[in-house]
Amino acid sequence: MANKEKLPWDLEEEILSRVPPTSLDRFKTVCKRWNALFNDKTFINNHKMTFQFVLSTRSKIYSVSVNPKVEVRELTLNNPGLKAQRHKNLFATSGLLLCDVGNGAVVWNPWLKQSRCIKLEVNEPSLDFLGIGYDNNKRVEEIVYKTLSVYMKDLGSQYTWKIHDFASDTWIDQEIEKTKYSRRITEGSVTIRLTNLSVVSLNGKFFKFCDLPSGKNRRRDALALRVFREDRFSLLRQCHVTKKIKIWVTKNKIDNRYGGDVKWMSFMEVSIPTMPDLEHPKFNSQPSYFIDDKRLVICSCDETGRAWIYVVGGNKLVSKTQLDSVVDPWPLHCTYFPSLVLVPGGQREEAELQVQFQFPYLCFSYMEAKNLHVTTELYVPGKTKSSIKLHYG
């Protein structure tokens, strides 16, 4: 018996949380409520196919989720640029991954299976991609993404910023003052010095952003800067001698003002003498991490290069899991939060027009979002199927 009625919202949300991410973006136009739901970070984080880390080896790329069980999945590499050679660097910004592949880079949204290759104007063996960002110009509605890289024009000469504009597909060079760049300590598009944080704007200028709360650090101390709750910074420091971990977060959200009004506050301290070193300078391996409420989740490599996931909470090591399926040692890794951000000018795999999901008592099938109705079939074993047509406008 067909009835024109709506399912309970919590059930509807549960069904949508099982829809493949490649179709979620298309479904934004179904109704305002769905559009608002898909823009909600809580929905994205609770999606059945979400993950928190990305690891790259010589030949494969993996996603790792911790919910709370650690699950490792191999991500498909449908872009020739991702398959061609070992990645030099791996960065994540706003749901996009930047993979430095030596002779260029690939910008990738693994959740949406979209990618785009960035080709160099000329071969620059010394060029390193450092990150991806966008102009913080509120007067422009469309976000213009840019990548930041650095290279040495000639042996012994000073470094030069190289900035790629996605919209125009053009490159801009900007020379760097010799005293303002150190290749060893650059992390993404920010540079962590011993006592302060410097940033590079996308016009190639270099600014001191703020002082760091960690004070003076030893050479083998782990020091990692990450985004906290989307609009703030967090800083992790592990003392090489005592293994003590301390985390600070910025009190207020970060804006585009370069100044000294950034205030840090102590967020977490963990003292576990048996905690392994999170940094291995020989291989330039820094930890990746995220903070979930009062739980600290870290991805790091041990002294043999094997990848591990450590979950810390309540001043104790809750669990540690070796990622056995990641075979190659010393993988690149980064924290990654999925999003529905489209890769500018990117190519997407063709999604199937109809997908079906199995629940214990529910079979949900849908067509592309261009059809403004969804048919849901409810099935209870031993009884006849019934259909409910849901109409949205």
UniProtKB/Swiss-Prot annotation:
Residues 1-47 form the F-box domain. This is Putative F-box/kelch-repeat protein At1g32430. The keyword Repeat applies. Kelch repeats lie at residues 151-199, 308-357. It comes from Arabidopsis thaliana. It comes from the Eukaryota. The keyword Repeat applies. Keywords: Kelch repeat, Repeat.
